[in-house]
């Protein structure tokens, strides 16, 4: 039986949760308005741009003007400090050239966030003189970074064909020795339907985008085994779970893995799999509850310690048998 006092308490609790939610929305809106005021000059264009979903000329307080959509504007507004760090030039609709010293990249504005994350160590590893297998190459940014870190070759797997023109431009601009495959990875060879958002701000096997496309999938075990790579980087939403079914023998053909993980369940399964395959979790960069980048290193010391022990047992067993 529910008493009147109980109903009143539930009512109050419900109203409080609504008020808290509304306050949260107001705070987010106010924060956005303040950032807009502090970073831009052409305030009268902001609302029409958001409502019409069309490109509008937006002038920032550093004097630069770009023809932007609302999502592109938010990237620059919310990361305004990066406009001081990088030279950003618009060379077409949804096409920007980003430069930082010798580093030159062409792509969408989302590439700016990827570049900054990598410069902050997202994919940092010892790849000097090594071959890197880059699964989820996006627009070629990570391939360029691996090359700048000394990789002698980068093997790129990127299933979205529209990204390949950027990959080719970026590896040419930065003189990257690369091999490009228009494929994704999975448990077996075949094709798969994926969803994605426009304007190319999200893509993955798990996302619920407005657009659907079919991509070619290669067996991840086959790709690893034939690559001859020393380092593997995987950033393809949902595809990382295919590593769980790869044999330890094949996983150990690689020295170092960099894996972007998109669910806590896959994270736990991968940690268990790699530890059982004689890898140690060297580092983990957590971005939120679901998203993190894990760095697994093959434990050569433990393997070399096991081998003499096994070899030492063999003569003793032989003596017992005689």
What are these regions (language model features)?
Residues 1-322:
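Phosphate/nucleotide-binding beta-alpha loop and adjacent structural elements of enzyme active sites
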């Amino acid at each position: 039986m529910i008493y009147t006092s109980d109903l009143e308490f539930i009512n109050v609790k419900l109203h409080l949760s609504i008020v808290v939610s509304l306050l949260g929305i107001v705070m987010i809106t106010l924060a956005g308005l303040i950032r807009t005021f502090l970073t831009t000059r052409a305030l009268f264009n902001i609302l029409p741009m958001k409502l019409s979903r069309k490109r509008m000329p937006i002038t920032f307080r550093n004097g630069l003007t770009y023809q932007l959509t609302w999502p592109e504007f938010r990237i620059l507004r919310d990361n305004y400090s990066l406009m001081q760090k990088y030279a950003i030039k618009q060379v077409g609709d949804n096409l920007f050239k980003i430069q930082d010293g010798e580093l030159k990249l062409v792509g969408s504005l989302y590439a700016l966030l990827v570049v900054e994350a990598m410069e902050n160590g997202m994919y940092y590893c010892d790849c000097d003189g090594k071959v890197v297998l880059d699964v989820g190459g996006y627009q070629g940014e990570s391939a360029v970074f691996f090359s700048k870190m000394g990789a002698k070759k980068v093997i790129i797997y990127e299933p979205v064909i529209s990204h390949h023109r950027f990959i080719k431009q970026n590896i040419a601009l930065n003189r990257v020795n690369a091999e490009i495959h228009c494929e994704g990875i999975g448990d077996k060879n075949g094709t798969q339907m994926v969803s994605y958002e426009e304007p190319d701000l999200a893509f993955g096997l798990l996302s619920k985008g407005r657009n659907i496309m079919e991509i070619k999938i290669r067996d991840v075990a086959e790709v690893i085994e034939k690559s001859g790579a020393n380092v593997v980087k995987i950033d393809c939403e949902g595809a990382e779970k295919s590593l769980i079914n790869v044999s330890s023998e094949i996983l150990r053909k690689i020295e170092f893995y960099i894996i972007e993980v998109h669910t806590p369940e896959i994270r736990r399964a991968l940690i268990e799999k790699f530890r059982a395959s004689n890898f140690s979790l060297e580092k983990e960069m957590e971005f939120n509850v679901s998203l993190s980048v894990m760095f697994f290193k093959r434990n050569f010391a433990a393997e070399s310690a096991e081998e003499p022990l096994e070899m030492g047992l063999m003569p003793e067993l032989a003596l017992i048998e005689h």
